[in-house]
Amino acid sequence: MTDYKATLNLPDTAFPMKAGLPQREPQILQRWDSIGLYGKLREIGKDRPKFVLHDGPPYANGKIHIGHALNKILKDMIVRSKTLSGFDAPYVPGWDCHGLPIEHKVEVTHGKHLTADRTRELCREYAAEQIEGQKTEFIRLGVLGDWDNPYKTMNFANEAGEIRALAEMVKQGFVFKGLKPVNWCFDCGSALAEAEVEYADKKSQTIDVAFPVADADKLAAAFGLSALAKPAAIVIWTTTPWTIPANQALNIHPDFKYALVDTGERLLVLAEELVESCLKRYNLEGSVIATAQGSALELINFRHPFYDRLSPIYLAEYVELGAGTGVVHSSPAYGEDDFVTCKRYGMVNEDILTPVQSNGVYVESLPFFGGQFIWKANPAIVDKLSEVGALMHTETISHSYMHCWRHKTPLIYRATAQWFVGMDKQPSTGEPLRERALKAIEETKFVPAWGQARLHSMIANRPDWCISRQRNWGVPIPFFLDKQTGELHPRTVELMEEVAKRVEQEGIEAWFKLDAQELLGDEAGQYDKITDTLDVWFDSGTTHWHVLRGSHDIGHATGPRADLYLEGSDQHRGWFHSSLLTGCAIDGHAPYRELLTHGFTVDENGRKMSKSLGNTIEPQKVNDTLGADILRLWVSATDYSGEMAVSEQILQRSADAYRRIRNTARFLLSNLSGFDPARDLLPAEDMLALDRWAVDRTLLLQRELEEHYSEYRFWNVYSKVHNFCVQELGGFYLDIIKDRQYTTGANSVARRSCQTALYHISEALVRWIAPILAFTADEIWQYLPGERNESVMLNTWYEGLSELPADAELDRAYWDRVMAVKAAVNKELENQRTAKVIGGNLQAEVTLFAEEGLTADLNKLGDELRFVLITSAASVVPFVQAPADAVTTEVEGLKLKVVKSGHAKCGRCWHFRADVGSHPEHPEICGRCVDNLNGSGEVRHYA
C-alpha cells in the first residue's frame, strides 16, 4: 500500500503553536532594544506628518497597578496605530516627581528631624529609585517609547522650565498674592489642590445658635414695627461649631421672606419657610408677628454670643432653605462664600480673624479656647453657647465631607496668605483666564463627548487657583517681596530668568541656597526671599511648556500643542484641568487638540478594586502567568468610556480569544511553506474567484479597521479581527482551501493562487494586530516569507490588497449567498454526524433543492461546489423536486438532503468518489489525485 502522505503539500512552520508569552516576550523586548527600534521609528518618521500624544506623568511612587497598565497600553495602541497610519508618533514617557507623598515617605523612613536640604536630597533619590522600578514595569507591557530619555519634573531642565512658565504668567498679570480660604490639611501642614480632595462620610455636631440683636430699633423698623416688645435674636445653623469663635457676619438671602417669631420669652428671626421646622426642633411654640424681605435686614447688627463684637447682616445669594434656619453664620477665614461676601462688603484682609493655626490648634490668645485642637474644642464651644443662653439645639449628623486624599483626615477651609492664579483677573492683554479656558473647551474634541460638559462645569465654577504650598520638596516660587509693602520686586520676571538659569545647572536647590545679594545687590536688605513651593499640579500642568517646547521639543509644524492627552476620568479636575489653565494663560489656547478619557477598573461584579476585598489584579502577575499580550488584548476588547471590568476569569477569556487569533496566524504561516512572494505571487487577475474574494474581504475590513483605529475604538478592532479569524477565515475560507492547498500540484495555479491570498491576508493581519498584540505581531513578522525589515512597526498598513472588479460575476453579494448556503449545509452535516449517519463531512453527498435564482448562482461553481461545501459530491436540483424528507433551511428557497456516500474513500484526498481504483497503478486513490500526481493536474477556476 502506497504512502500518499509524502505526495501532499502539508502545512509546515516553525512558528510555535504554544505562545509561551511570559518567556518569549522578554526575548522580544531584548530584540527591540538591540535593533534600536524606537530610534529607527524616529528616523523613518522624519518626513512624515507628526502626531503627538503627550504623556500625563504618573507619580513616582510605588509599583504600577492595573490602572497604570491600562493607561499606558491605551497610549501605546494609539502611538502604534498612528505610526502604522503613516505618522511620526513619538512617545516620551514622563514622571511627576515633586510633592507631599514623596516627602511624606522620606519623613516616615528617616524621621521629621531632617533639614530642608537633606529632605530634598532624599526625595530626589527616592523618586529616581521609584522611576527605575516603574520604568521596567512599563517596558514589560510592550510600551514603545523614549525610555532612555524620559521627562521627569525633577530634571533640572524641567524645573527651570516650570519657573519660566510661571514667569510668563506673572508677566501677563495672572498671578497675585491674596488671603483666601484654601483647602487645608493639618497633617500636610499645607494647602491642597482641588484634585487632592476626596469626600467621605463624617459625623458632625450641628448647632442652632441665637445671636442677640444690637440694633433693636433698626430690626423693628425692618419688620414694620415701632419697637420690639421683647429681647430679640437671629438664629443660625451650622455643622462647624469650631468656626463660631471666628464669626464676623451673618448672611441671609435678599429674596427670601424672613419672619419675626414670638416664642414667649423672646423674639426670633428665622426664614419664614422654616419657622415650623425650627420651632419643632427647639421644642418651642410661637407665632409669626411680622415678616420682611431679606434685603430689608441688610447691615442690621447683632452681637456675637460670647465675644464683645458685632456681627452685621450681609446679603448673600448662596443661602439656601434646604436645612437650618435660612441664616448662615459667616467666618470669612474659614469659608469660601463667607470670604467672598465679607470682601464684597469691604472687609480688608487685616480685619479677617484667623485664630486657627496651620496645625489645627487655636492660637493661645483666643479667649476660652486658646491652645485647643479645633475638633476637640467643639464640645467646649457648645457648652459655652449653652452657658450664655445662645444654644437653641444640637444634634449629631453624618454627612459627606472633604478629606485629604493622602491622610484620609478631614480638611477645613483656611484663609492664609497664598499665591494665586486669578480666574477672573484682567491680564495685561486679552481676556481673563476663565473666559479663555471656557472658549478653549469649546474648541477641543472630547472622547467620550460627555467630558466636555464636565470640564466646562468645573472651569465655570472653580475659584482662583492657589498655586503655593508650604513644603520642601517642590519647585520654588522664586519671588522677592518688599519688606515694607509686601509687593513683588519690580524686576521679578527678569530675576526669575536668572533663577531659572541657576536651576538649570543645579536644580531647585539653587534657589534655596541662593544669597539674595547675589541677584539684588544693595537692595537685598529691602526684600524677603520667599520659601513657598509650587503646587505639583503646576509641575505637570506646565509640561506643554517645559517638555513639549523645552526638554523634549517635538518640533510640531503647528506649534507646541499636543494632538492628544489621554488619562483617567479623574483628570478632568487634575492634569487636563491644570494644563488647560496654564495653556490658556500662557498661549491663549488649550495645550491639546483632543482629550480622551478612560474609566476605572472594577471587578466582574462592578466593585472597585481594593486589597481589602482581595479583587485586585496585578499587571506584574498577569505578565508572569499569561503574558502582557493578554493584558493588551483585554484592554482592546473593553469599551474604555465607562468602568472596565477585569478579573482572572475575564483575562482567561482574553487568553482563549488570543489562542484563536494565534492559531489563525499559525495556519496562515504553515500554509505559506515553500512560498516566495518574489517568485510565486500571482497578479489578482490570475487568481481563483474565491481567493480574489478573500483578498477583497480583507481590504474592506482593513478600511473599517483603519477608521476604528483613527477613532480609538479598539473594541471594534478587536471584535472585527476576532470575528474575521473565527468566522470568515476559520469558519469559511480556510476550511475550503485545505483540499486545494494540500492536494494540487505544489506549483500549480490553484495552489499559488491560494497562497497568494494567504500571503496578502497575513501581511494585512500582522499589521492589524500590531498595535494590540505588540509582541505576537512582531513574532509573526519574523516567520512571514519574503524579504522584510526588522519589525512590523517599521511599516504602514498593507497596500498590496486588491478589490474585486465592479463587474465581477462572482461579486461580494454572490459570496454572501454562498456563505449562507454553506452555513445551512454545515448545520445539517452536523446533525447527520451526531446521528452517526456519516463519520465526517467528506463521507456526505448533498443535494440542494433550490429556487431558480439560487440554482443559477450555485451552478456557476459547477463541480467545484463540492469543494466549497466540503462534501464528496454536491448537486443542485430545482426546488419543486424536493422530496418530503428534504430539510428546510433558513435560506429562503433552499431545501437540502444529505446521504452517506456509497463510494470508496480516496487514500490521498479522503473524498469518497466513484473513480477510486479506476487507475491500475494507483488503486487506492481517485482520478483527480492521479491527475495531480502524474498528469497535468486538475484545473480550478473558482474554489
From Swiss-Prot:
Keyword Nucleus among UniProt keywords: no
Residues the record lists as binding ATP: K611
Cofactor notes: Binds 1 zinc ion per subunit.
UniProt signal peptide: none
Binding site for Zn(2+): C906, C909, C926, C929
Catalysed reactions, semicolon-separated: tRNA(Ile) + L-isoleucine + ATP = L-isoleucyl-tRNA(Ile) + AMP + diphosphate
Stated family: Belongs to the class-I aminoacyl-tRNA synthetase family. IleS type 1 subfamily.
Subunit comment: Monomer.
Protein name per Swiss-Prot or TrEMBL: Isoleucine--tRNA ligase
Organism of derivation: Pseudomonas entomophila (strain L48)
